[in-house]
A protein has these predicted regions:
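Thiotemplate assembly-line natural product biosynthesis machinery
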Residues: 1-25, 76-86
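Amphipathic alpha-helical interaction segments
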Residues: 11, 45, 67, 71-74
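Hydrophobic micro-packing sites on short alpha-helices
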Residues: 16, 49-51, 72
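Phosphopantetheinylated carrier protein domains
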Residues: 42-67, 83-86
Length: 86
């Protein structure tokens, strides 16, 4: 599985676009969640999907500390790298 930052961003963008019923290109990974129309229910759904897809635990406050898809991807990449580091 590709766990690069860009792969995580692509995964999150596709998931959010599907939930919001918009084109993937309309999901700016640099935009704040509220600007994208991501409410708490969608944020929780995204969090759950990310946890299942990448087999990682993510605390809910992570989304508040990282309020863009890019920031979430950076955070996840760091968490995944720590998990596989010797």
């Amino acid at each position: 599985m590709d766990t690069s930052e860009e792969a995580i961003v692509r995964f999150c963008r596709r998931y959010v676009a599907d939930l919001l019923e918009i084109e993937v290109d309309a999901v700016d990974p640099e935009a704040d969640f509220d600007h994208l129309g991501i409410d708490s229910a969608i944020a929780v759904a995204l969090l759950t999907e990310v946890e299942e897809h990448y087999d990682v635990d993510v605390a809910p406050e992570t989304l508040f500390d990282n309020p863009t898809l890019r920031a979430v991807a950076v955070y996840l990449r760091e968490q995944l790298a720590r998990r596989v580091a010797p």
